[in-house]
Amino acid sequence: MRSPSHSVLPASAARTLLVLALTAGVSTAVPAAQATAPEAPVATAAPAAPVAATPYMGWSSWSMQSSKYPGLNPDGDYSWLTEQKVLQQADAMAAKLKKYGYSYVNIDAGWWRDNTWKPEFDANGRQTADPVRFPRGMKPVADHIHAKGLKAGIYLPVGLEKEGYGDGKVPVWNAPGCTTADIVYGDLRTTNGWDSSYKIDFSRPCAQKYIDSQARLIADWGYDFLKIDGVGPGSFKSGDNHDNVADIAAWQKAIAATGRPIHLELSWSLDIGHIADWKKYSNGWRIDTDVECYCDTLVSWENSVDDRFADAAAWSRHGGPGGWNDLDSLDVGNGEMDGLTKAERQTYMTLWAIAKSPLFTGDDLTRLDAYGTSLLTNREVIAIDQSSTPPARPVTATGDRQVWAAKNADGSFTVALFNLGDAPAAVTADWAALGFSGRGSVRDLWNHKDLGSLKDKVTATLPAHGSRLFTVTPHGPAQATTGYEAEAAGNTLGGSASVADCGVCSGSRKVGDLYLGGSLRFNDVVVPKAGVYTVKVAYVSGDPRPAEVSVNGDAATTYTFPSTGDWGTAETVSIPLSLKAGANTITFDSGSGYAPDIDRIDVPKRA
């Protein structure tokens, strides 16, 4: 994430500072000395719906906790969070948003800490409610939320917090003979995104019992959602000490043992290389850093709403029932406090919906403006997020003008147009990029309007950072194309370029090593007449990479190819190329950088 141009810390730095107080003086912190009486466990009826069958919808406290918007945190940074304010948000959600599918009321960091960030732990090293923020404890809060027909969420950092360790003699609940010294490594190595916890050693039998005790407490309080934060690999950390896969596996096991369906969400900037673990053990994973700007508004376009466009594509294959790609909080409902233009607010929600991200807002639900309400309650857009359609991804090479799409179960397409530039621009979705030709009927989802049957494409002039969202239903045939393999003997390789095996590529081969002047030229690309052709490029790239593309030796245009997620996955994007009648050459050149590996191109048989 970029740092803002003004003197406000980026989210990662702000969260780091937030935890400095958390780690200060921990060598003398003894939970038994500061413990409050544990809240009596009382069984609460569990919700019956499957966990994470669709992306969850709701609200989270962190955006308002972290903002410096005037009057929002009058008693110091992160002071917004109190029982009264959470219950006000729950009441507002029940009144305004519940009927549209919003159901989770999630309490984020700080519920066990006072305004100076001093923590509260029970006699067994488990976080418990700060008596000023939550004077009745955490169970009555969940009870109130449930009484509104909603679900309650809570938050913990990964690992054993240093203050919870105490002197190492703190007993683990319901585990005779186990103390906090028996669940961590002997050298007290640290873990999580802030190194604020001791790493738990799950080769020790007492370790699972401690996680079991935490899960039991949360379940007995009646919570339906748990966010575990600072998880690695991710959270800007790597290496053995910050590998928390075993922690998440332990949490999944502990939650299952409670018998209560609890949604387990992971944060932040998770390593995509461990996606199999995140899918196996959790119901959602944050793909990026905090969306909040830690500034005088809740968010800003540059810090880091716009960054999601570069990052979401890599994860698009991974979201589905049971576990979803989390783009973070959706702060589009409060107008000035959000820090965005109306166009940016619509674009923000458009991306979240097509990416099948959870739709949870961090706005003040008691102060939603009319425009924000219209965004958050647009049933057609919500339906895209909640449908069985897979997450969308770019179907054009990326830049300021982007087209994202996903094919729906009924054969139609969800299509989003984005203008990420700073000036108005026309953006076009060609039917060829979707794989069909002729006509398609177009439905404008934001405006609830049918645009009729359009030939070959849909174009919209968008404001800066603007968007449109459509359902496109094909009425023409599949696009007829001629395929050209990158590894074909008639092509010309230059510089470092070489042919390599590729199990996910057509023909099981590709051209790679396109770096520092490496190039691939397709020879004898034949079309019947001159025109602009929407050429589909199949490629592999573990990160976003540019390529300089030229036709017949003319000046090159640089296109950026979105990440395919790893070097074992192939995807396609389309690029417009002006071809002459007859034979053409199409060259992919890495220039002075590194280009994606190329599998093949498919050229329409007509322009």
Label the predicted regions.
Residues 346, 352-355, 360-362, 397-436, ...:
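Carbohydrate-binding surface patches
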